[in-house]
Amino acid sequence: MIGLVGKKVGMTRIFTEDGVSIPVTVIEIENNRVTQVKDLEKDGYRAIQVTTGSKKANRVLKPEAGHFAKAGVEAGRLLREFRLNEGEEYTVGQSISVEIFADVKKVDVTGTSKGKGFAGTVKRWNFRTQDATHGNSLSHRVPGSIGQNQTPGRVFKGKKMAGQLGNEQVTVQSLEVVRVDAERNLLLVKGAVPGATGSDLIVKPAVKA
């Protein structure tokens, strides 16, 4: 089953009949419009390309304008692609709504996490701090040793060090679908999802469900 592109609206909570409070993230999923269908013969794999939302006319590049015009759909703010399974068929110009999640119990949500700028190892990787006293006057939050000696004579790739924190693609798996509001194009999922309010999200049926 394909996924859809949505937008993070924010968090709230809803109550069950027993009075239990459930924290939910509200995701607005406007109708996704199919701009291209890829097939095995021409592209080597089966997939659909979709767009959503809108874009100011003066912001649409000429190649984009031609691509959207060929599909007969309004120019959207982005393009995303979803692989098709056997038996799934879509046509160019078709509109796909949030209702495809009506029978889905859990979803995976992918977004871009909030950027935190340059961060040290304590904040970025949860390193322990060194002694506050006992002779330590300069190295309270430094990482310590980052390698060995002449052998191997280098720092191993992947070593956890200070650097950019956040602003990277993050996927949260198996979030429970609490409610699907087709009238308002809303999907409510239990828990938090990556990204700032207003950021784009990709919602897919959970692979581990």
UniProtKB/Swiss-Prot annotation:
Modified sites of kind N5-methylglutamine: Q150
Q: What is this protein called?
A: Large ribosomal subunit protein uL3
Q: What does this protein do?
A: One of the primary rRNA binding proteins, it binds directly near the 3'-end of the 23S rRNA, where it nucleates assembly of the 50S subunit.
Q: How does it assemble?
A: Part of the 50S ribosomal subunit. Forms a cluster with proteins L14 and L19.
Q: Does the keyword Phosphoprotein apply?
A: no
One Gene Ontology term of the molecular function aspect: rRNA binding
One cellular component (GO) term of this entry: cytosolic large ribosomal subunit
HAMAP family reported for this sequence: Ribosomal_uL3_B
Q: Which Gene3D superfamilies match?
A: 3.30.160.810, Translation factors
UniProt keyword terms in alphabetical order: Methylation, Ribonucleoprotein, Ribosomal protein, RNA-binding, rRNA-binding
Q: Family per UniProt?
A: Belongs to the universal ribosomal protein uL3 family.
Q: Which domain of life is it from?
A: Bacteria
Instruction: Provide the record's note on post-translational modification.
Output: Methylated by PrmB.
| The keyword rRNA-binding is annotated on this UniProt entry | yes
The record's Gene Ontology biological-process terms are: translation
Question: What organism does the UniProt record list as the source?
Answer: Proteus mirabilis (strain HI4320)
